[in-house]
């Protein structure tokens, strides 16, 4: 069975639950729920669960290292499960995209995101797939930290379930059809 590591970035703790910065956690939680995966288990460097589709095992990870040390969890679980870099997908919040916009990329810069920055530093490369989930940037100058650690608006919540489902479709397509086909299919939406 071919293994994939799907990492939703976020911060642990009730104060961060369902904040914009935790959209990665929310995405893998929704993917697990929709696919009837068992509950997440507290393991080394994170909480994991898995499910299989068409000969592929998707291992879902919510790092418990806090955002800025996410690379430790990614490296550990890649090594533990013997997963090659091309089978790793990081789900991350993105301030530069309007809320709900989803963009799959095969590589790229960290765009100022400390979780991605640490992953690149630990893995020694920026050449890993990431699914950027737009959280918008409707905040006053100097208000970025409060914004990303804030909760979604009622307006955002209206489309949240649909956007999380679409993110799950993108993740499954990444595992089944590959990144190029998936980017062509979904990045236009």
Curated annotation (Swiss-Prot):
Q: Where is this protein primarily located?
A: cytoplasm
The entry's cellular-component GO terms read:
cytoplasm
Q: Check the record and name the InterPro entries matching this protein.
A: Pept_tRNA_hydro, Pept_tRNA_hydro_CS, Pept_tRNA_hydro_sf
EC number(s): the record gives: 3.1.1.29
Q: Which reaction does it catalyse?
A: an N-acyl-L-alpha-aminoacyl-tRNA + H2O = an N-acyl-L-amino acid + a tRNA + H(+)
Q: Where is this site: Discriminates between blocked and unblocked aminoacyl-tRNA?
A: 11
Q: Which domain of life is it from?
A: Bacteria
According to UniProt, where does the site described as Stabilizes the basic form of H active site to accept a proton lie? 93
Record keywords, A-Z:
Cytoplasm, Hydrolase, RNA-binding, tRNA-binding
The yes or no answer to whether the keyword RNA-binding is present is: yes
Where would you find this protein in the cell?
Cytoplasm
What is this protein's function? Hydrolyzes ribosome-free peptidyl-tRNAs (with 1 or more amino acids incorporated), which drop off the ribosome during protein synthesis, or as a result of ribosome stalling. Catalyzes the release of premature peptidyl moieties from peptidyl-tRNA molecules trapped in stalled 50S ribosomal subunits, and thus maintains levels of free tRNAs and 50S ribosomes.
Task: State the oligomer form and interacting partners.
Answer: Monomer.
- What's the protein called, per UniProt? Peptidyl-tRNA hydrolase
């Amino acid at each position: 069975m071919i293994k994939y590591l799907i990492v939703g970035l976020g911060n642990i703790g009730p104060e961060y639950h369902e904040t914009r910065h935790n959209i990665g956690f929310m995405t893998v939680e929704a993917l697990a729920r929709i696919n009837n995966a068992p509950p997440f288990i507290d393991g080394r460097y994170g909480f994991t669960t898995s499910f299989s589709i068409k000969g592929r095992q998707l291992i879902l990870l919510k790092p418990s290292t806090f955002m800025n040390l996410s690379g430790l969890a990614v490296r550990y679980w890649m090594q533990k499960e013997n997963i090659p870099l091309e089978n790793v997908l990081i789900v991350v919040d993105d301030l530069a995209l309007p809320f709900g916009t989803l963009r799959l990329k095969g590589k790229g810069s960290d765009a100022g995101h400390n979780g991605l920055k640490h992953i690149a530093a630990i893995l020694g490369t920026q050449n890993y797939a990431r699914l950027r989930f737009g959280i918008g940037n409707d905040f006053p100058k100097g208000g970025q930290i409060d914004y990303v650690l804030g909760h979604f608006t009622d307006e955002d919540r209206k489309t949240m379930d649909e956007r999380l489902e679409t993110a799950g479709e993108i993740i499954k397509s990444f595992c089944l059809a590959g990144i190029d086909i998936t980017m062509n299919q979904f990045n236009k939406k």
